[in-house]
């Protein structure tokens, strides 16, 4: 055997000269040594291939391959067992030719084989490779217990292992340290016998003519990153060997360093989860990830760059860590891709689900769906998309692919798996049948020509991984990270497949072989599927043939060549770095490639070599097991042409034509990964069915529904989802609806993006649009329009033609009022020129530089020192931090009309620039004009002012902010405002301009309080000179941190804490409803103010600043104003409250917030009635007779809270500006006068009015507010909001639609009586002289005060006892059943807020609409209505019923009124729903029907008309309040109101109002179609209140007996049931009285609620 083996192996080794067969060249023959061949020192001593030889220390892979040549150069190609036998191999047998035939270990490190022989641009010959020889142990048969008898083999067998026992393979690494791997034999011993035939030398020379032949292998390096090689790696594993023919590369093909040529197949982005197949794509993507400046090393210090993403690093360690991140990310992605592929495999034709496009079948719907994705976008000519059929078995078919069957590592001997799909077969025959059926016809075979022509049409989803290799054959792969060695086609004439594949071959079983767990080990492995040529073609479309071609080559089975072996688990690490190349022959006859290569193209030397191998295998004398082993190890000569074009292609990364690639292209990893796309952030769909050309294109992806384009699939998918969502189509069914349909649907429904309004902001002019009134700048006309509306609301104008712009209205108003001395907009003195509105007239300077300090007191730079950095240059306020100053500056900007959204930049600079542009308007501050220019003038004006600017803007807008305390240090007001009381600044008191609207400008909105804390003399602060303009200084910015409770003085960090604290105080007082602005803080302040006013010693308030200013001062002062329940002197505003009687609407009567009077039911009993409404529109000013609150009312005593109003009333012109205590924007209902914090609340409120009117569509602009306004206009109802009384005559002013602004002057009439509840449609108190007993309160909550509206609605009928108990200030916080019916107009009930939850029929108030709805249902049941046909709401249904059954309503109300005859006036008064139904109150002097009382306390002439439309004159008793109430009680149209509410508009519905209402109601209403039975009548309500509540505890009395119910609101149910029992017992006959619109209080309706 020795001789035969040696001879047979040596025979081919005899070629002379250049034909010497190659063997690993001796070390000394390698030019420059191994390093020269390999570069990089000891990384890889041998560039490429591991010959299966007895190799010594000259390990080709330098420790990686473990196969090394001996120092003497001898590297005979011997059987592994001939470890010591080197006789047959001559050292001179080396490569001296251009071609070398080398054998490759299947597990040899891919890095080495991946490398070209040329390093650093220097061509290296293959012969320069070190040679070495491995040592193998024969695997003996059972009967062979000794060493082989073939001494000639020089077999060095340490011991005869038992049959089928693991054999040991010993490799001698570079350092000659043997490394041993124990291999478990998988397969029968007969398979090992074939190894005997392998004992021939490993070096054979080929003629130079073989230059056309070259080889490639794919390598995997688990330890090193794709671009690096680790120096010394663990030993190699055995496996089939490949004899490779490498053509010497032309000089131009320099082997780039590993970092360049070893491109990974997957390029993951370590910043996100996206990965790419092309490095270019990753580089492009990385541009989206900009490193922080600190992370980017300096250019001169960053020579190291990541080969994948291009990031530069100055430190090699950092670069290495970065690469490891790439590698870890890559492996994770690959692992995830494999998991996606692990779906149930092919189950054959017997399966329930069969693929219509291929032979795949399965019983798993999930597997079927996954498989179907393979065909999703498959080109028509393709049958399957994936080379391996994606673990479902439908992958790349190839005929008779049994050669590619492998056995999973650790699997049973008889279990094999298909390399294409991983299908496990219990037997080889079944596996072959599987391959024949499933992988029989490669689709590239069907239209190979097309593929050659169009790479994009090639199959598979790995978009650039498939190509036809006409001159290439792809190597098989085997290992956990199977390295795919290129397979080359060989001339059939020179190759006998029978030699390689015997019938009894075992399927190759490599550890964790490809499809089951590819690439699960080896963090640093090079990407699988790389060709040997170090080119960027690694990811070009040419890896498809790998498995397919293999299988087609040897249908009879590759396993004979591939000894099935498996290794111990613990040696997994060692094998990871082994070059693993399995070889396969793709012969043309197998159909894998068209027979392009003719025998002439195959070097004769290669054919001779193959023949020599064949003969050697046949001649070797060994047992069957040895033969099998040798056959698995003998090289298979694969021949392919490698032309110059291929060499060039190896250097060119871009997409190449398949014919150019040959063996040069590297196969991307995705080939092994079942065609998983490696080139983009694509979803599984794209993974499985991507277009090969797609990844190669850099073009963006286009949305199928619109022209938008996207860089990645994620963005496109999200965008497409948006399209589909808009048309109501699920993303998952997008394939069932065409793009045209989607587009059509979108067009049909106008699903178009709203065009964003481009702000026409011109930094050169700061604003293209400015308010003519206050100069505030706006970017858009819409913003200016909204701002103008606010000004108009300030002037009391809320109704205008819908087609007219509020900007134009404001301009006209200013133009017409200029001659009449309109309210000085920006502090312009009344005598100033009409056009001196500061902002509109000031030059507009570009807002480019920070506000220069030229206007400041200090000529030096404003930022010269730290102090200036935190001091407001406008008002001098000092702040601890710049942040506080910034917040303060924002408040100034708001005052100047610049919303926060407009001042997104630095507010400080913006403010300074704005002030600079406006020249620090001194006019609006009342300062001398020069003040803005220089501090000198300011100093003249303000004695101690540290900065003139302090006074100039004086926080004018503090108050305007809706009760937002402007946060400045507590001492702010004191700071810089040391100006003496006589300071002219303070002289600009707006008292004279009480009637003029305060501009919305910063100054105009600010309360008129001087900035100086506690000015020495209130008079100095509030000079009453009537000719002086309004003091536009607001009380200094509210202390930023000085938010304190005005009741107990406790400090809080913010308003939120104070609000919670105030709620606790209010609850203690029994007040549970925050009737002032909905704010407990303001409510508490109002209560405290009333108490303060009620103090007899309080001096009468001198005329206060403009009501709006005061309102702002008070409302905006919020907590910051520090208005505490202290002596008035302690309060900033106290002097105002004491000294100046606020103008009629002026908030000064109350606490700075001038909150509206609390509703009677919620008001603390001991509190004085609020003297001022929040919003002081003429119509809002209401003469409120708070019987409960006026202990001495019967005796004609002034109510304490009204004292301050007594004297100064005569000189005040009606202030037509609503005091700004209400929500800043002064949003109020034009129908009922109720205020709202925002338009949203008003809109909801307006909807309720409209529903009551039977209007359910908002026909005007789609806005219920505009619709209601339009209806009011059509009804010709004078809208008091529009009318402002002339300064001289308040009542006429109310009646007429005068301009909103009134010439500044002393208020002539004591006070304009606001329409009831301040609602526009309600009559106001007519007589100019209103008794001091009446508190004039603008209706703040739009809720009539139960106690007295000097309005037609009879004030709550007070019991004599109630009135006679002066000490018992009955806040009427209880629902009084016998209250005079609040003639709530139909719309009045509408407010959904708890304050407006009032029954239209009986007038009962409820805490919320839910309770009201329950009450309405009871009414409806009484009237036989059981379906709520109007909007499904019983409340609205009842309203409709009232409209259509006026007679019944009248009868019912008449009954409730104690049998008084029903009159139509009653009905009209009670039910007027539309504004037209309410005559304006007090428009005429006699129109004060509500209270018809003259100021002296005697009922006015029209008092009689108040409630019943003038039918009953009011009693003329001096205690007009009592008389009025008496009279109101008697009025037919007074509906009993259970609960005294704050004066509501309903009160105003007396007098002419009732007449008008009645007439209009009669016009509008249809005659009742029929009369339905009325619920049984109950006894007349008692004269005492049946319902009282304090806090949340209700006391409900039975009107029939003495039983009382006490408890929360839920106690009402028991009370109602009790009343119902009484009613049932009375058994009244069901009369049918025609009640109409009276709204009775809860208690009354409760009785009516009896079913």
UniProtKB/Swiss-Prot annotation:
GO cellular component, one term: nucleoplasm
Modified residues (Phosphothreonine): 998
Main location: nucleus
Cross-link (Glycyl lysine isopeptide (Lys-Gly) (interchain with G-Cter in SUMO2)): 883, 939, 955, 967, 988, 1000, 1005, 1056, 1108, 1112, 1138-1139, 1177, 1240, 1282, 1343, 1356, 1370, 1372, 1382, 1448, 1464, 1477, 1523, 1534, 1560, 1630
MF terms (GO), sorted A to Z: DNA-binding transcription factor activity, RNA polymerase II-specific; histone methyltransferase binding; protein-containing complex binding; RNA polymerase II cis-regulatory region sequence-specific DNA binding; transcription corepressor binding; zinc ion binding
Positions of post-translational N6,N6-dimethyllysine modification: 1162
Location(s) in or outside the cell: Nucleus
Comp. bias (Basic and acidic residues): 1523-1541
Region listing for Disordered, in residue ranges: 1-79, 376-399, 546-578, 819-843, 972-1038, 1091-1174, 1283-1331, 1463-1554, 1629-1651
An example Gene Ontology biological process: protein stabilization
Location of region: Interaction with CTBP1 and CTBP2 2: 1214-1218
Zinc finger (C2H2-type): 267-289, 304-326, 353-375, 416-439, 701-723, 769-791, 870-892, 1043-1065, 1227-1249, 1397-1419, 1596-1622
InterPro entries: Transcr_Reg_ZincFinger, Wiz_C_Znf, Znf_C2H2_sf, Znf_C2H2_type
Keyword line: Isopeptide bond, Metal-binding, Methylation, Nucleus, Phosphoprotein, Repeat, Ubl conjugation, Zinc, Zinc-finger
Location of the region described as Interaction with CTBP1 and CTBP2 1 in the Swiss-Prot/TrEMBL record: 1030-1034
Cross-link entry Glycyl lysine isopeptide (Lys-Gly) (interchain with G-Cter in SUMO1), positions: 1523
Modification Phosphoserine, positions: 996, 1006, 1012, 1017, 1025, 1079, 1106, 1122, 1127, 1134, 1146, 1151, 1263, 1309, 1314, 1480, 1517
Stretches with biased composition (Low complexity): 386-399, 984-994, 1315-1328, 1481-1493, 1637-1651
PANTHER family associated with the record: PROTEIN WIZ (PTHR24396:SF22), ZINC FINGER PROTEIN (PTHR24396)
Domain notes: The C2H2-type zinc finger 11 mediates interaction with EHMT1 and EHMT2.
Family note: Belongs to the krueppel C2H2-type zinc-finger protein family.
Functional description taken from the UniProt entry: May link EHMT1 and EHMT2 histone methyltransferases to the CTBP corepressor machinery. May be involved in EHMT1-EHMT2 heterodimer formation and stabilization.
Complexes and interactors: Interacts with EHMT1, EHMT2, CTBP1 and CTBP2. Part of a complex containing at least CDYL, REST, WIZ, SETB1, EHMT1 and EHMT2.
Name of this chain's protein: Protein Wiz
Species per Swiss-Prot/TrEMBL record: Homo sapiens
